[in-house]
Swiss-Prot record:
Pfam families: DOP1_C (PF24598), Dopey_N (PF04118), TPR_DOP1_M (PF24597). GO terms for biological process: cell morphogenesis; cleistothecium development; conidium formation; Golgi to endosome transport; positive regulation of cleistothecium development; positive regulation of conidium formation; protein transport. Residues 1-23 have a biased composition (Low complexity). The lineage of its organism: Eukaryota, Fungi, Dikarya, Ascomycota, Pezizomycotina. Residues 1838-1854 are annotated as: Transactivation. This is Protein dop1. It is a peripheral membrane protein. Residues 1070-1079 have a biased composition (Polar residues). Belongs to the DOP1 family. Involved in cellular morphogenesis. Required for traffic between late Golgi and early endosomes, and for the normal structure and organization of the endoplasmic reticulum. During the vegetative phase, contributes to the highly polarized hyphal growth. Required for the reproductive cycle. Involved in conidiophore initiation and differentiation. May have a role in controlling the balance between vegetative proliferation and developmental morphogenesis.
Length: 1858
């Protein structure tokens, strides 16, 4: 076997140097023998032999030679001196010779030397030196060859077993662990020898037990068994050997061949004496160790181990054993039974069979296969009798296992764990346990509800992904539970004792919420559930619901009662969704049902509930299917009767706003889902609803409307369910509809938009069942007719007309379906259905127009002017007119007229008057509708694109004209006497014709001066108060006067428009004199004519009228006045603009606030027409700004242009003109002031419109508090959003740059909720599409960076205080928000801009980093679209990015700025809208965000390398070399480094940067969070790329040297320098090992071990000195955390010897030259880490440091602990320092996790001279007890805490030589 000589480390420490181990027991008699000449000669020969280990070992044969020399030297001992000189070093070298990597020949020779030494020192010497020698041979069986194993076993048997029991006692657990590998294979040659050895140890241990107080002399090895169980708990790798021994020698701890009888008591004292003695030997003094031995074995990773432990349970430890039932704690039994149940997760049948055998007990006597002869008849009879007394399997489990298993599962459920797999474990275990009904049938009822509560609570606390994983397991569990059990538990949840309601309402509510959660989240729709259980549970819930409204609940607080009622209602809603008619149509198979259904229906609810409970109780206690408690048909009647009675009670009581809608809706749902029932035949509900409607007065509140809405729905639904008129007849419906319509009509008040949509929906609902009889129409018509006052004639009031307008508008906006097919008359069309409700009331409304200038007539006129569906009004009138004309054609010729019968004169006259009145009310849009719409519904005539069919259909305009033409042309002029009616008919017909032919005319000029008088009158009325109608009349008159007076002064030539361009939305309220909202400049030739002076007080009057509350009802009139008079003020509009804008803005905000509050309040909301007021004011606002802007354009066009001397050519000179041409070329000072005034108004308008637009935005989820009016809210908010968006569209079209700057300013000051809305708006508006917005941002930036180079027409006026950095931040965020597809629109603009910037980068130096980010965003979008497939574009962008980086590094070198805290800013926050959080100079954050795009965009490897090299040279390098390093680094720097390290081709670049940083002496001053989150990942990558990193660092570690300067001035400084270098390199090694994968540096381990050996030879005066010992211990900690058992095995001799020396030095105080306090602390931390992790090989050494057996808790009499920790604690004493014991705080177990005890931060801050007193003394006090408790708790080590503590120590610079 060839070996690499270099792989075996040797120490360079001189062999003659005596060990510093000061423990007297290991020193023996050497001190007194040193004067003996023979001994000195003997010791010298041993020393010479030992020196060979350091100098001559090159290959494995040298080891044998060394061992032979050592043996010969030992054989020269004087006969009278049986001692071993330098025995500590001898033991260490022998231990190193037992290295597993050496061949077996070396091991044999080493064991030969051990044998000689043991023989030499005799048992007396070995008893004292066992801690010295045994650790060296303890691991032998884990690696020994077949030839070595017998030698080891013989050595133990001959010498170790021969020692005194007191010497073996501390090491017994370690000896057992060392022997157990020999039992793993029962067929091996060493198996019997090992078994014999263990039995010998058990016999020796029984002699030890007699030393314990109260122990029996025949206790049969209590101490052995306790150590044996501990070995099983702590060492999973040795459990196969443990099982082999337990199977043979573990006593039976209970009766395993039969189950106890029903009356047999389980008592430990009833066991036979022999069994009691055996039991005591196993479980005393600590029974918990036996349980933990089994519990850990049952949770082992190997199936074989689990299977064998289950076998042991079945054969040796039955569930009925008195030990389990009486001798151990309940928690321990829970632990054992849950561990056993946990094997089901393996889904292994062999495991499950054994588990069932243990949980259910032995098979019955008759079932067991017997190997004996057939029993006799008499014995069979006696056995049968015994059998009948035996517990059944189900009873056995229920008695012995149910309670601990259920409690254990619930305890498992309550564990606080972050892992969803652990949270789901109880569900999976229980699901598998349900495979056996004997177990699952008992367990599931005990855990079902707690499991469901746990899932519900977990949903609220856990992330969605975690909850989903747990919920999948919970769903599987739920689906496995029997339906009857589930609904039985649900029944218990919703059923409560009526007496407990007042005192226990929170618990009842919690149960209801849980029931709702189960029904809502789990599958309760299985066939059995919906057919058998859901109806019963629904009935029970309905009974409980009726109880809540009974008199018994009067003592319960109202809010509690309401909460319980709401919870129960939610449950009932879900339950009714489970009802299906099939469940009630089945044949009855019930045997115990009541004979008469009437008797059943009359039974009280409590009796029915009791019967349901009895049904579920019978089902639970019987395996047979139980008959249902009620026949299906009776059950349906019971449900319907309950709901029916509650509905009647709710309607009669009407004391709860919600109860009526809930109960009525519930009734309808139930009736629809259940078969027909005769319960409702008594008509009590019909009578109750009728009384309620007749008795109640209309109150405008949410509750009142909710009642009406639900009743109207109930009536129509009852009429239509199953078949028409089954539950309620048509006559009964006809009786209820009129009063309902009368009450619903009140909710259509025009004073508030609340409930409009809902009320109209209810009216159409009622109309759908009664339309053939026109019930709703006739009722509405009757409501519109009001009794006239004396001496007057009034058809309808203004208020009633307003209600009808709302009905009309929402009837045409909403989509109301046709009635059910069985209600339709085939001859009737959809049109007749709609008109059958709207026609008669329409004529009633239009009749008001005939009243001339009265207020109602004006209201109707205003309605018609704004009516989009005015064509439908004409269709209804014309259809009537055509009917009259058609009758005339059929009847023939009449006297005086050939068209109309004299009998129809009145009707025809009436219809023409109506048409005349409607035409008189039309506005421009109305005329357009008249010209384009036809009589056919939903058709429109198009001038150019209409089809031929449509073109042939005459327009409404044409139809009316033809009808009037018919009347006129049919008149006979030759009659003698003219009928007055006929003359009137002619007059009205001609009038209609004239209207159609002329359209709106121009009023004649009026006398001057009347306008001032009217203004004064209007002003005084506003002051003094007066009728609104007079105000309106005055305004109309004034408008007419002003129009006539000023029309010629401001009428320009008509603008040219496209042929089919549609008019703007604002034109309908403005004079045609106003210019349209456009940014196109007027022609220069247009001459500004002088205007007459307006009346003096006109403006003041206007402002007063707009802001007066008295004018709200006619606000439209005031706005019209404003719009019409604006041209009068064209010359001075800039002086009055801000005043107007301020007034209008204030009023808009007030009105808008009122509108918002209307939808938030449920009562007492504002009723001042806020909706219409806001719309009207917005129109005036828009018109004002439009007029001012158009006047500004005209003035700028006519101003003399100043020539610009130098025009730049480039992006800003060449961009397509006309986008922002609204600026003048070179405005004068006055013009600049005018422009500023207009732009300030624009800003106000943008901010105001945005606030309105964002009201109903879905992103804000700002639903009104009153959900009853949600539809109206959505309609109103959408209308507001559309209006404000149109204004914004116009504003952006006119002044895109200024509006965009305003939006940027709002974005900067906005919060996180508002910021996305700003971008949503920009994406919505056509005027701010990317093609316009991106160049505008460029213009805004260039205006601030280099305005001289910008074309003057493109400059911003800078009315908003924005900086270029804020604009650049907005540019980046806006670009990121754009869709990838818009790239082709903005590509040329963006690249031209970037190139333009690069041509002169200095002015833009502040925003260059932002432009890099912008270019990177373009790169990402380029990759995501087909547009980016052009390589030329990618190359172009790559060039720009490279040039930008160069420009940044040239204009602003990072080295100059980074030390000034450049990177102290927070990193880039993409989602933040606050510019303050986005540092424009934070180049690192920008590069982090952009690096992924760089690698895609740059494409070519040379370019990527160039970019990374630039970044490395200009950013990374300066940071690493900076004076502030490493404090100047942050997460952005680390993220940038990690991004670069993922690009494999540039490894050469970043490797150097990492190496520079890592080798910098200041590196270990880095922040810990950066190390964990950044450097460790980088170092892992670095080690993968450069595999020689560790070797290279190790070459810098020089062995300690004593030559050179020993004294003098420079000696101390040189030594300190050498110490610091060694410490740094050792820390680098530790960090590299920690950062890489486990065993990554396995090849370098031998060399590292040699380096550590060399450094451990240092003294206080060497160079480097012994000050490096602390870092050596850190390296060992890192190795323990990151190495496997095999890799670590050569290090244990070194670890053991050094750790013992260091800990011994703590109490001795004479080793200060070798161990400073910090070295001692690190040694203790190494021990702490070993105790937490407990590696297998350390368990063989653990007894040297702590008492690792039960003696730590139960010490025998006169016990003197030999463990180091106990000795140190004894020597230091138990006195405390002034501080408390903080170290022990962190050693506590946190939820079953072991934490290191020395990891607290305060320990690192403890002064050097206080470490022993404040830190180490408390640490060693009771360390053995704490170590034993952590083992006993079966806790898992917290590797993360150990790693973090080591990192904190590594990066603690205060402990290094300085």
């Amino acid at each position: 076997m060839s070996l690499d000589p270099s792989s075996f480390p040797r120490s360079n420490s001189p062999a003659s140097s005596d060990s510093s181990l000061t423990r007297s027991r290991l020193r023996g008699k050497e001190g007194s023998l040193k004067k003996d000449k023979n001994y000195r000669r003997y010791a010298s020969s041993v020393e010479r032999a030992l020196s060979l280990f350091d100098n001559t070992l090159q290959e494995w044969a040298d080891y044998i030679s060394f061992l032979s020399r050592l043996l010969k030297a030992l054989q020269t001992h004087p006969p009278d001196q049986p001692v071993v000189p330098h025995k500590v070093l001898v033991a260490k070298r022998l231990s190193q010779s037992m290295n597993p990597s050496l061949p077996s020949g070396v091991h044999q020779k080493a064991l030969e030397v051990y044998t000689y030494i043991f023989n030499l020192i005799k048992p007396e010497g070995l008893s004292h030196d066992l801690p010295l020698y045994y650790p060296g041979i303890a691991p032998t069986l884990t690696f020994a060859s077949l030839t070595v194993r017998p030698l080891f076993l013989s050595l133990v048997e001959t010498y170790v077993c021969d020692l005194e029991p007191w010497a073996i006692r501390p090491a017994l657990k370690a000896i057992i662990l060392s022997l157990l590998p020999g039992l793993e294979e029962e067929t091996s040659d060493d198996f019997d020898s090992t078994l014999r050895l263990l039995n010998t140890l058990r016999e020796i241990a029984s002699r030890m037990d007699t030393q314990r107080p109260g122990a029996e002399t025949n206790s049969s090895g209590q101490y052995f068994w306790q150590c044996f169980f501990l070995a099983s708990i702590t060492s999973p790798s040795r459990r196969l050997g443990i099982l082999a021994y337990l199977n043979r020698y573990l006593p039976k701890l209970g009766v395993t061949d039969r189950r106890p009888s029903r009356h047999e008591e389980v008592d430990a004292t009833a066991m036979p004496l022999e069994m009691q003695v055996a039991v005591d030997s196993v479980i005393l003094p600590e029974p918990g160790l036996l349980i933990r031995c089994f519990a850990t074995g049952l949770t082992d990773e190997q199936v074989l181990v689990q299977r064998n432990f289950l076998d042991l349970l079945v054969t040796h430890l039955p569930l009925s054993s008195p030990i389990l039932q009486t001798r151990i704690t309940k928690d321990d039994l829970q632990r054992l039974i849950v561990a056993a149940a946990g094997v089901v997760s393996r889904r292994d049948m062999s495991l499950n069979r054994r588990l069932w055998a243990w949980l259910l007990g032995p098979d019955p006597v008759g079932d067991r296969a017997s190997f004996e002869a057939r029993p006799s008849i008499s014995s069979t009879a006696s056995k049968t009798a015994a059998e009948s007394e035996e517990l059944s399997q189900s009873q056995y489990f229920s008695r012995f296992g149910l309670q601990p298993l259920a409690s254990g599962l619930l305890q498992l459920l309550k564990r606080d764990t972050e892992l969803p797999s652990e949270k789901a474990k109880p569900f999976r275990i229980t699901l598998s346990l349900m495979d056996r009904w004997e177990v699952g049938g008992h367990v599931v009822p005990a855990v079902f509800l707690p499991f469901m509560r746990s899932v519900k609570a977990y949903k609220l606390a856990a992330p969605k992904a975690h909850f989903d994983e747990v919920f999948r397991s919970a769903t599987s569990f739920f689906d496995g539970v029997e339906s009857g059990m589930i609904f039985s538990e649900l029944l218990n949840l919703i059923d409560w004792d009526a007496k407990s309601l007042a005192n226990d309402a929170p618990r009842i509510l919690d149960n209801l919420n849980l029931a709702h959660f189960i029904l809502d989240h789990f599958n309760v729709r299985e066939e059995d559930m919906v057919l058998n259980h859901a109806p019963l549970l629904t009935l029970a819930a309905l009974i409980k619901m009726s109880e809540l409204s009974s008199e018994a609940t009067t003592s319960v607080a109202h809010d509690q009662l309401q909460a319980v009622s709401n919870g129960l209602s939610k449950v009932v809603t879900l339950l009714t969704g489970l009802l299906i008619d099939r469940a009630f149509l089945r044949k009855s198979d019930s045997k115990n049902s009541v004979n008469e259904p009437s008797m059943l229906l009359d039974r009280p609810g409590s009796a029915i509930l009791r019967q349901i409970h009895q049904f579920y109780d019978r089902s639970r206690n019987s395996l047979d299917l139980q008959p249902p408690p009620f026949p299906p048909t009776d059950l349906a009647d019971l449900i319907i009767k309950n709901v029916y009675e509650q509905a009647i009670s709710a309607v009669n009581a009407c004391n709860d706003a919600k109860s009526i809608p809930e109960r009525l809706n519930l009734l309808i749902v139930v009736l629809k889902k259940l078969p027909r029932s005769r319960i409702l035949r008594d008509k009590r509900l019909y009578v109750a609803i009728g009384k309620h409607i007749q008795a109640s007065t209309v109150e405008l509140s949410t509750a009142s409307f909710s009642h009406l809405s639900s009743m109207s729905t109930t009536i129509t639904s009852l009429y239509c369910i199953h078949k028409l008129g089954y539950y309620i007849t048509y006559e009964e419906v006809s009786d209820l509809i009129p009063p309902l319509v009368r009450q619903l009509w009140q909710f259509l008040s025009p004073l508030s938009p609340k409930f409009h949509v809902e009320a109209v929906r209810c009216l159409w609902n009622l109309h759908s069942v009664s339309w053939s009889d026109h019930l709703v129409e006739s009722t509405i018509t009757s409501l519109m007719f009001t009794p006239p006052a004396p001496g007057s004639y009034q058809l309808s009031s203004e208020e009633e007309a307003g209600r009808y307008f709302i009905l009309w508008n929402h009837s045409h906006h909403g989509t109301y379906e046709l009635p059910p097919k069985n209600l339709q008359d085939s001859a009737q069309s959809q049109a007749s259905y709609h008109s059958s409700m709207l026609e008669r009331p329409l004529f009633t409304v239009l009749d008001l127009l005939s009243q001339g200038s009265t207020q109602p007539a004006q209201v109707v006129q205003l309605w018609l002017q704004d009516l989009p569906s005015v064509a439908k009004v004409f269709r209804i009138i014309i259809s009537k007119l055509e009917g009259v004309l058609h009758r005339g054609n059929q009847l023939g010729t009449f006297e005086g007229n050939t068209v109309v019968s004299p009998d129809d004169y009145a009707e025809c006259n009436y219809l023409f008057e109506t048409i005349h009145n409607v035409l008189g009310a039309l506005n421009h849009n109305g005329w357009v509708s008249l010209l384009t719409q036809t009589m056919a519904h939903n058709s429109r005539r198009h001038d150019a694109s209409a089809s031929e069919d449509n073109a042939e259909a005459p327009s409404l305009h044409s139809v009316v004209f033809q009808a009037s033409l018919k009347i006129v042309s049919g008149y006979k002029s030759g009659t003698a006497t003219a009928n007055a009616e006929e003359v009137k008919l002619q007059q009205i017909s001609l009038l209609v014709m004239r209207q159609l032919l002329l359209g709106p005319g121009v009023e004649e000029l009026v006398e001057s001066g009347i306008d001032s008088l009217l203004v004064d009158r209007l002003y005084s009325m506003l002051d003094e108060g007066g009728d609104i109608a007079i105000q309106a009349a005055l305004i109309d008159t004034l408008l007419a006067v002003l129009k006539a007076r000023f029309s010629q002064a401001y009428l320009p030539p008509p603008p040219t428009k496209p042929k089919h361009q549609r008019g703007g939305s604002r034109e309908k309220l403005t004079s045609p004199s106003l210019l349209s909202f456009t940014s196109d400049k007027p022609e220069k030739s247009s001459v500004l004519l002088p205007s007459p002076e307006p009346p003096q007080r006109l403006l003041d009057c206007l402002l007063k009228g707009l802001s007066s509350p008295r004018s709200r009802a006619i606000i439209d009139k005031w706005i019209m006045l404003l719009c019409e008079i604006l041209p009068i003020y064209s010359t001075c509009i800039f002086q009055i603009l801000l005043t107007l804008v301020d007034c209008l803005g204030r009023e808009i905000r007030q009105s808008y606030t009122n509108l918002q509050s209307a939808f938030e309040k449920t009562e007492g909301w504002p009723k001042d027409r806020p909706e219409q007021t806001t719309i009207s004011l917005l129109t005036g606002f828009e018109t004002c700004i439009a007029a001012a802007h158009e006047r500004l354009l005209m003035e700028e066009v006519n101003a003399p242009a100043a020539k610009s001397p130098d025009q730049t050519h480039g992006f800003f000179g060449n961009m397509v003109s006309g986008v922002f041409a609204s600026d003048s070329n070179h405005p004068r000072s006055a013009a600049m002031n005018n422009r500023l005034t207009v732009l300030l108004s624009f800003q106000d308008a943008v901010r105001l419109c945005f606030s309105i637009w964002s009201w109903g935005a879905a992103e804000r989820s700002s639903l009104p508090q009153d959900t009853e009016s949600i539809a109206s809210f959505q309609y109103t908010s959408l209308r507001m959003r559309n209006r404000s968006r149109r204004i914004l569209e116009h504003l952006f079209t006119a002044e895109a740059l200024e509006c965009l700057e305003t939006m940027v300013d709002m974005w900067i000051k906005s919060d996180r909720d508002t910021s996305p809305l700003i971008f949503n708006l920009l994406h919505t508006l056509d005027g701010s599409r990317p093609k316009i917005a991106i160049p505008a941002i460029f213009n805004a930036i260039y205006t601030r960076t280099n305005p001289a180079a910008l074309d003057p027409s493109r400059k911003s006026t800078m009315t908003t205080a924005l900086t270029e950095t804020e604009l650049a931040g907005f540019l980046v965020t806006y670009a990121r928000s754009l869709d990838d597809d818009v790239l082709d629109e903005i590509w040329i603009d963006c690249t031209t801009f970037l190139r333009d910037v690069l041509s002169n980068p200095f002015p833009h130096r502040q925003i260059l980093p932002r432009l890099v980010e912008f270019a990177a965003i373009l790169g990402v979008k380029l990759e995501n679209t087909n547009f980016g497939e052009d390589r030329r574009m990618r190359k172009e962008l790559g060039d720009v990015i490279l040039r930008l980086l160069t420009a940044i590094f040239t204009s602003k070198p990072m080295g100059f700025t980074q030390e000034q805290g450049l990177l102290g800013r927070a990193s880039l926050d993409y989602d933040s809208s606050s510019i303050q959080r986005i540092g424009p100079d934070d180049m690192l954050s920008i590069l982090v965000a952009s690096m992924p795009a760089f690698s895609m965009t740059l494409g070519d490897m040379d370019r990527i390398t160039t970019a990374v090299s630039n970044i490395s040279t200009n950013i990374i390098g300066p940071f690493i070399r900076a004076r502030l390093f490493p404090n100047n680094l942050n997460t952005s720097f680390m993220a940038l480094m990690q991004h670069i390290s993922k690009i494999p081709q540039v490894a050469k670049v970043w490797k150097k940067d990492v190496a520079d940083a890592f080798n910098d002496p200041r590196f270990f001053g880095s922040q810990l969070d950066l190390v964990k989150g950044g450097w460790m990942t980088l170092l892992r990558q670095w080690a993968l790329v450069d595999k020689d990193r560790l070797s290279e660092i190790m070459t810098r570690l020089t062995p300690p040297a004593t030559a050179g300067i020993m004294f003098g001035v420079g000696a101390s400084a040189a030594r300190l320098d050498a110490d610091r270098k060694a410490q740094l390199n050792l820390r680098r090694i530790s960090l590299l090992v920690l950062s890489t994968a486990e065993d990554y540096f396995i090849a370098e381990m031998p060399a590292l071990l040699q380096k550590l050996e060399d450094l451990l030879g240092a003294t206080a005066s060497s160079s480097p000195s012994s000050a490096t010992r602390a870092e050596i211990f850190m390296v060992l900690r890192a190795l323990i955390l990151k190495s496997t058992t095999t890799t670590l095995s050569p290090f244990w001799p070194l670890i053991n010897s050094e750790l013992q020396e260091a800990i011994s030095a703590i109490s001795s105080g004479n080793q200060q030259e070798l161990y400073n306090p910090y070295s001692l602390l690190q040694a203790c931390k190494l021990l702490d880490t070993l105790l937490v992790l407990a590696p297998d090989d350390f368990q063989l050494l653990e007894w040297l440091y702590v008492t690792d057996t039960v003696d730590a808790i139960y010490p025998p009499e006169q016990f003197e602990p030999t463990a180091l920790a106990d000795e140190v604690s004894h020597n230091l004493g138990v006195r405390w320092s002034t501080s408390s014991d903080p170290t022990r705080e962190s050693t506590n177990l946190h939820h079953g996790v072991r934490y290191p005890g020395l990891a607290a931060d305060w320990i690192r801050e403890t002064a050097k001279d206080e470490i022993v007193d404040r830190v180490l003394r408390p640490f060693f006090d009771q360390l053995s007890i704490h170590a034993f408790e952590s083992t006993y708790s079966i806790s898992n080590p917290n590797l993360e805490a150990c790693r973090d503590d080591l990192l904190a120590d590594l990066f603690n610079e205060s402990t290094m030589a300085n």
